[in-house]
Amino acid sequence: GLGDVYKRQLLFRFVSSLAVSMSTVLSIVYHLEVVQLDAFQLVLVGTVQETACFLFEIPTGVVSDLYSRRRSVLIGMFLYGLGFLMEGALPWFAPVLLAQVVWGCGDTFITGALEAWIASEEKDKPIDKVFLRGSQMGQIGGVLGVVLGTLLGNINLQMPVILGGSLCLLLGLVMVRIMPETNFSPACLLYTSDA
């Protein structure tokens, strides 16, 4: 049977996808109407976020491979939450720009680390089924996040960004308590033991 790690990764995939899609579904509208960015600033915000993701990909991968996949995922979730809270609570150009770096960095901490954590913790399980179910839960959470974000955004455009960020932080706190890491070996040990 499939165990606790399987259920926890389903929870993580569902809630994280819900929170991120809730925070981002109306981001262009939020940036235009609330933050009142002009066309150049909009392009700059997108470029900074993409650049942050690119630049942090290698250093954050090192954390995952050498120190802890669990730690990498948790750091990423807290950075997502902090970035979205900053973006939603401080609707001015400079904080919104900084928020893109923060949550873009958070994204790179999670990318790859989550899959590696699942694969190492569930190594005796049918991993294709584990990943498929995780992906399905992420898609369901993402769709629900779009619906909730749109409904909340009709009330107040800051609300879905702030609530999504808060949900990321709450998920991070829950995962600190329930996310095990029992099968991790630093990558440097794996490389040297093969020699």
Residue ranges and their predicted role:
Residues M175-C188:
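Helix-loop junctions on the cytosolic side of multi-pass membrane transporters
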Residues E50-F54, I58, G142-V143:
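Residue-level signature of mid-helix packing/kink "hotspots" within the transmembrane helices
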Residues L144-V161:
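Transmembrane alpha-helix termini and helix-breaking/packing motifs in multi-pass membrane transporters
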Residues G1-Q9, Y191-A195:
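Conserved small/polar residues in nucleotide/adenosyl-binding loops
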Residues D4-T51:
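Helix-loop boundary and gating motifs at the non-cytosolic
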Residues W103-G138:
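Cytoplasmic helix-loop-helix junction between adjacent transmembrane helices
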Residues F78-P91:
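C-terminal ends and interior cores of transmembrane alpha-helices
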